[in-house]
């Protein structure tokens, strides 16, 4: 499908180009990678299959461009980011169309992702000027045994080349959440988008290109993970990796060497429901948290842990709401759309079959057509079922009945994941106690898990990640402290 208008330069025939040195290029490999439309299950787009040699050239350009960019005034960096944000919003329709066709994101949600991304870039520009515009001044005599003979000046300087690897489910938003902090902090960026979502990411990168960033500062390489995946993450030219995705991140962390890592690797986000909870509120949040974008969100509700005494009432309320969810193509803004791939659908079906064999109660009939899976609530799930522990990344939600708060906390903490969780109760003291006890990076009280607003800290523990995201944390993570010490010939005291 050919691009039109100002975006036409990024495509050659039916294959989208990759971006390097401020230009859109065809790969010398002569190969391409097909992107399958999850709804039609037919090829929708093609992108370049970049070679390792092309990655080497990108890294050289990124290193060179970063040296000049680090000398660019903060206000100028921010100015260009604001410009990119505005262009991103101008092209929201074209980018959203790609999201609909590449990852089956409902049309309205696709537009929202692009607009949200523009807002993130602008906020990052403003926050970066504040954070990076301030340093620290220390004097030596504040430590015992020292006279005031040393002045210490500290500042934050860029790391160098940042490798950004976003996931398929938010290929634009979770790309700019890495790109914008890196750029405002004075780094260069090499983006490796997911295959599903690569064209949307290329359109997004084109907006940064139109904003006028220096050549080589931003690169976007596409291709097969088997060819350039490890080559990128182990490349000696990379000074930091920001990765969002699955357990591939664990392998990356073992291979990447001594560089800073920012990792978000998924979760099994638990929803603990106490006896005094507002069940209407809980049911609404279970629907929003568990089934939005067909459950393909790291922060989706992945398991409901509800007190036995209110379980029947809650399950009935959720069943009523599940029945009202629309199912169909993303172009129709359906609530439930196809999952991203056939392999994903097969994995989800495997979890469902395991639960069926082991006696879970099906609140709806299991139904699947191609990659489209109808929303399913599974009651009376037990810990011996795979769905109790594994992340389905689909519209299937298990309910585990518990007899005590401690039982719910134990199940939550027994997971190898620790991204987010939530607790519903009218007792704020109990809520805080449970939040403290849950081994999760974030705990929401009386609301479903969520990433955002984008300036909030966002982090996982255990196998859910390394480090913390959010605009401020990402800017800080993509810098290092530089210290300059002025040595005085004799002690100097103010008004001395």
UniProtKB/Swiss-Prot annotation:
Catalysed reactions listed for this entry: D-glyceraldehyde 3-phosphate + NADP(+) + H2O = (2R)-3-phosphoglycerate + NADPH + 2 H(+)
Q: Name one GO cellular component term.
A: cytoplasm
Record bears the keyword Oxidoreductase: yes
Q: What name does the UniProt record give this protein?
A: NADP-dependent glyceraldehyde-3-phosphate dehydrogenase
Q: Please name the GO terms that the record assigns under molecular function.
A: glyceraldehyde-3-phosphate dehydrogenase (NADP+) (non-phosphorylating) activity; lactaldehyde dehydrogenase (NAD+) activity
Give residues annotated as binding substrate.
116, 169-170, 297-299, 451
* EC main group: oxidoreductase
Family statement drawn from the similarity comment of this UniProt entry: Belongs to the aldehyde dehydrogenase family.
Q: List the disulfide bonds.
A: none
Q: What does this protein do?
A: Important as a means of generating NADPH for biosynthetic reactions.
What does the UniProt entry say about where the protein is found? Answer: Cytoplasm
Signal sequence extent: none
Which residues are NADP(+)-binding?
A: 192, 195, 230, 391
EC numbers, comma separated: 1.2.1.9
**Residues engaged in binding NAD(+):** 245-249
Active-site feature positions: 264 (proton acceptor), 298 (nucleophile)
Task: Provide the site residues for: Transition state stabilizer.
Answer: 169
Sorted keywords for this record are: Cytoplasm, NADP, Oxidoreductase
Gene3D superfamilies annotated for this entry? Aldehyde Dehydrogenase, Chain A, domain 1, Aldehyde Dehydrogenase, Chain A, domain 2
What species is given as this protein's source? Pisum sativum
Question: One Pfam family of this protein, by short name?
Answer: Aldedh
